[in-house]
């Protein structure tokens, strides 16, 4: 019998740890460590950038909500005043058409608004020829005299509209005209003239009711809203004439007419409310602008704040996040450098 062939012992296929580690030493392991650190740092920076971008968008969105709500609230406040004065002109007109208007009614109707004398400074009657008849402070017209007011825009728009064709844009749907602010030559005070035509059913014009409004009331109300040194509120007509304006808490620009390329003139004019981010042509400051039409009157309330102010808290967050991430980056790179230097020494 032949001897059986001896079966060789099974080979150990496991790689010894020393050989395995030897394969990862040197430049290969160095590259793996470096790439891992860079990948983690890149992910960290991307996360920081995306988070900061999201926070910036949230800050601007919050500013838009704030300005939009303020514009709505301020227009409601403006509407309450205008509606009370408007009702006074309607009552006075109806009494005149009915032939029941007496000098004593001027004061009674004006006082019923609750706005005399701080807001509604005068409620007047002008005849069909444009002459002053009387008012709540001069019922018979003896103090003032029956002066000719036919050349005034708020009277012409009703008695001779062809002479002031552009004034029609300041007429409300039911016939109330809201004029530009006028600076009194004697009183040196601004007033806004609201006027309504007195017309009989047969088309005969009997005159005009004129309500003189004190725009300082709106300036005072708007100045109570803290919008920062570069923020403000403006009450603007369709004719781009400023009825009231407060910038940085200070009244300014009463009676001025904005140019066609002004910040507010460049905003949509046909929408009832809205917002936009605009850059001023004058001071080059970017602002968040919100606006709201004042009911059916040819007026709008604009609320503007600087995006710089809106992002002040975000900038603080950005500085902290970038600083911390920068320190983490430096520490990670330094740690990786120490580790790689140790590997080279082991080689």
Where are these regions (language model features)?
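Cytoplasm-proximal transmembrane signaling helix
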Residues: 302, 308-347
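Extreme N-terminal signal-anchor transmembrane helix of membrane signaling/transducer proteins, especially
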Residues: 2-3, 10, 14-55, 322-336
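Amphipathic coiled-coil signal-relay and dimerization helices
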Residues: 130-138, 240-247, 289-291
